[in-house]
Amino acid sequence: MEPRVRTVCFLFFLLRVLAEPAKNSDFYLPGDYLLGGLFTLHANMKGTVHLNFLQVPMCKEYEVKLSGYNLMQAMRFAVEEINNDSSLLPDVRLGYEMVDVCYVSNNVQPVLYFLAQEDNLLPIQEDYSNYVPRVVAVIGPENSESVTTVANFLSLFLLPQITYSAISDQLRDKQRFPALLRTTPSAKHHIEAMVQLMLHFRWNWISVLVSSDTYGRDNGQLLGDRLAGGDICIAFQETLPTLQPNQDMMPEDRQRLVSIVEKLQQSTARVVVVFSPDLTLYDFFREVLRQNFTGAVWIASESWAIDPVLHNLTGLHRTGTFLGITLQNVPIPGFNEFRVRGPQAGPTHQRSTCNQECDTCLNSTLSFNTILRLSGERVVYSVYSAVYAVAHALHSLLGCDHSACTKRGVYPWQLLEEIWKVNFSLLDHQIFFDPQGDVALHLEIVQWQWDLSQNPFQSVASYQPLQGHLKDIQDISWHTVNNTIPVSMCSKRCQSGQKKKPVGIHTCCFECIDCPPGTFLNQTANEYDCQACPSNEWSHQSETSCFKRRLSFLEWHEAATIAVALLAALGFLSTLAILVIFWRHFETPMVRSAGGPMCFLMLTLLLVAYMVVPVYVGLPKVSTCLCRQALFPVCFTICISCIAVRSFQIVCVFKMASRFPRAYSYWVRYQGSYVSVAFITALKMVTVVISLLATGLNPTTRTDTDDPKIMIISCNPNYRNSLLFNTSLDLLLSVAGFSFAYMGKELPTNYNEAKFITFSMTFYFTSSVSLCTFMSVYDGVLVTIVDLLVTVFNLLAISLGYFGPKCYMILFYPERNTPAYFNSMIQGYTMRRD
C-alpha cells in the first residue's frame, strides 16, 4: 500500500472517531456552496495534541483570542454581503462552516472534516479529480505552522486554501503547496518595511527577540540574512520562552525572562525588534514593567502589531515607543455594526463538528469594541478579500450572468484554476494573485497611542512592496525627553571625510578617523579607507573630494618678474648700443683687440639670450621649454667660450708664440679660435640633446613642499641635476677664462683684460654655484625667479663687465683707440720684458 493511501486510511479513521455535534449556528450557514473557515478563537501556545486518547483538544478550555473572533466575523460579513449582492453569484447562496483551531492545537480534525463528504466519509481513491468535498475552499488559518499543516492535506486534493495572515516565505513554494494562496504580503516585504524604518531613523544597533516556534525562528533568520553585511547590526538575539496559558510560569521560564530583560537593560541598543505571537508577550512585558525598563523603541511584527489586548496592558506606555508593521487599513462599510451583532438563534445543525463554540467571544468583543472600531480594518480586509476572491472565481466557473448561474458540482481543482485568474476591484483596491500566490497589499507602520480619543494604532508611514521604500512618513510622538528621536547606534555616524576603523566583530561598531590632507573618503567605494588624491589635486583634512591644485609659475604681474624684466630690457638695450658702437668703430684697434668679428658673434648671441628671458615667465609650454633648455644654454655657452678662447689667444700671442712658433702658425692659419668655439658649441649641443632626451620637453608639475595646495609647473622634472649637468661645461669654461686672464695680467694695458674677464667669469661661477645651493634647500616657485634673476645678471656681467669698459674707452678716450697708441704700449711691454 502506498504511503499516501495509508495516510488517508488513518485520517478517515480519525475523522470518524472525532466527529461531534455542537449547538451554535453562528459557525454554520447553509448554502449551495460552502466555504470552510479556520480561526483562532482560543489560544493554546504549546500545541499539545492528545493522540494517546485520540481526543480533539477542547479549545474553549483556553483563553479567548479576541482578534480571531474579529476575523471570523469578517468572513461571516463577507458571505452575507455577497449573498445580498445580486450582481455577484446571482441566485446562488454561499454558506460557510467555521472551526476554532486553538492557534496550533486543532488543525488536523477540521481539515479532515472539510475534506469529507456529507456523510463524514473520506473515501480512498486513486483519482480525486471528480471528488467533491464538503467545502469548495478553505479560508485560513492565521499562523504559518497551522497553514503548513493544513496545506499539506488540502494540496493532495487541490482544494483551494487562502490564508489571510501567514507570512512565511516557505509558503511561496508552489511545488510543495500548489493549492495555497495568500491575501497578505510575504515575510520578506514585512522584513523590508522594518529595515526601511530603521534606516530612515538611522538605527543601526538593534536587539532581536524571537519566539521559539517556527514563526519566530524563520522571521529572525530572514531579518539576519537581510541585515548581513549591511548598515544595521544585531547587538544580540534571544529566544522568548513559550508559556502555557492558564498555568503558572515555570521557574526556568521566569528566570529566562528576567535574564532577557536584564540584557536589554545593559545593552546600548535602544531598538528592540520582536517576532512573536501576541500570547507569548504578555508575561514578557509584565517583566519589562517590573524591571522598569523604559526608553526603548519596540518594533512589532504583524502578529502583534495591532493586538488590542496587549495594548490594554496596564502601564505598557511607560516602556517606550511602540511601532508595528501591519496591513494597510481599508474601511469596510457596515462591518463595525456587524462585528458586535449577536449570534442568530437557530436549530442545532446535526452535521456540525466540535470546536464551534465561543460563549465569551461576543462579550469580549463588546468590551474592546472602541479600540477595534478606531484601529480600523487591516487583517479583517485580508479575510474579506479572500472570501471575495473565492466568490469571483466561483462566479466565473459557474458561468454566471447578470441574473443567474448554472448550479453544478464544483471540483476543487477547477475552482483553484479560476482563483488564480481573478482580478477585481474591492473597495478601491485591486485584488489579484502574483505567480507565488500572494496579493500585493500595502503595509503600514503604526504607532501605538493611549489617548482614548484617537486611533490606538495610528498610521505614521506606508510601505508599498512593489516600490520597496517608505512613503507618507508622518511625525511620531516619541516617548523621550523633548520628543527627540531615540538614538540606537553602536557608534555615532562619522562626520564627512572621516573613515571608519572597525572595533570588534560588528560592522556598525567603529571609530571615526579624519582623512589626512591629500586624501579623501569615497563612501560609495570604501568607507573604511581614505583614498589618495590624484597628483594634480589636493584636499584638506576630512574631505570627501579633492580640488584642483593651483598651478604656480612665474607670472607677469608679480613685482619680482617686473623687476627682472626691466633689468633684461636694460641689458638688451645696452648690448644693442654696444653692438652699434662696435659696428661704427669696427676698424679701430680697440674693437680688433677685443676680438674683432668674434665680438659681433658674442653681442648677437647676447641679444638673443636677452630675448629668451620672457620665456621664463608664464605657463610653461613645449616651445618655451625648448628655448629655456636648449636655445639659451647654447647662446650663453658660445659667449663664454669666445671669452675663454680670446683670453687664450692673447696669452698665446704675447707669451707662447715665440716658444711654439709652429703651433701658433697653425692656430692662426686654421682659425684656431673659431674652430675652438665651434668645437665647444658642438659639445654643448650634445649635452643639451642628452639632457632633453633624459628629461623630455613636456612641462611637469611637482608639489610645493611649503604649501601642498600648490603645484609648481616647470620644464624639467629633475631640474637640479639637469642644471648641474648643463652648466658643468660653462663652469669649466669660466674657470679656463679666468685662468688665462690671470696669466695675462702683465700684458700691455690695452690688451690686459684680466680684471674684466675675472669679474665676468667669477660672477658667473659664484652665481651658478649659489643657484645650485639655493635649489638644494628650497623647492618653491621662488627657484624660477632666482634662476631667471641669475641668468639676467650673468648676461649683464658679460655685456657690461666685458664690453662696457671697451665702449667707455672708445667713447671717452678716443686718443687711446689709435694704432700708434697700441704700438707704443706693445713696445713698452717688450722693453720691460727685455
Swiss-Prot record:
Q: Name one GO cellular component term.
A: plasma membrane
Query: Which Pfam family, any one of them, does this sequence belong to?
Result: 7tm_3
Q: Which residues are glycosylated?
A: N84, N292, N312, N363, N423, N482, N522
Kindly indicate where the leader peptide sits in this chain.
1-19
List the PROSITE patterns hit by this protein, alphabetically. G_PROTEIN_RECEP_F3_3, G_PROTEIN_RECEP_F3_4
Give the main location.
membrane
**By its UniProt entry, which CDD domains does this protein fall under?**
7tmC_TAS1R2
> What GO molecular function annotation could you give as one example from this UniProt entry?
sweet taste receptor activity
Which membrane topology term applies here?
A: Multi-pass membrane protein
Entry annotated with the keyword Iron: no
Per its UniProt record, what SUPFAM superfamilies does this chain match?
Answer: Periplasmic binding protein-like I, TNF receptor-like
Q: Which InterPro entries match?
A: ANF_lig-bd_rcpt (IPR001828), GPCR_3 (IPR000337), GPCR_3_9-Cys_dom (IPR011500), GPCR_3_9-Cys_sf (IPR038550), GPCR_3_C (IPR017978), GPCR_3_Ca_sens_rcpt-rel (IPR000068), GPCR_3_CS (IPR017979), Peripla_BP_I (IPR028082)
Disulfide bond annotation, renumbered to this chain: none
* Bilayer-crossing regions: 562-582, 598-618, 631-651, 677-697, 723-743, 756-776, 780-800
Its localization reads: Cell membrane
Which ranges sit in the Extracellular compartment? 20-561, 619-630, 698-722, 777-779
User: What keywords are annotated for this sequence in UniProt?
Assistant: Cell membrane, G-protein coupled receptor, Glycoprotein, Membrane, Receptor, Sensory transduction, Signal, Taste, Transducer, Transmembrane, Transmembrane helix
Coiled-coil region(s): none
Cytoplasmic-side stretches of the chain, per the record, are 583-597, 652-676, 744-755, 801-834
Q: Answer whether the UniProt record assigns the keyword Transcription regulation to this protein.
A: no
Record-stated family? Belongs to the G-protein coupled receptor 3 family. TAS1R subfamily.
Task performed by this protein? Putative taste receptor. TAS1R2/TAS1R3 recognizes diverse natural and synthetic sweeteners.
Assembly behavior:
Forms heterodimers with TAS1R3.
Full protein name: Taste receptor type 1 member 2
Organism, as annotated: Saimiri sciureus
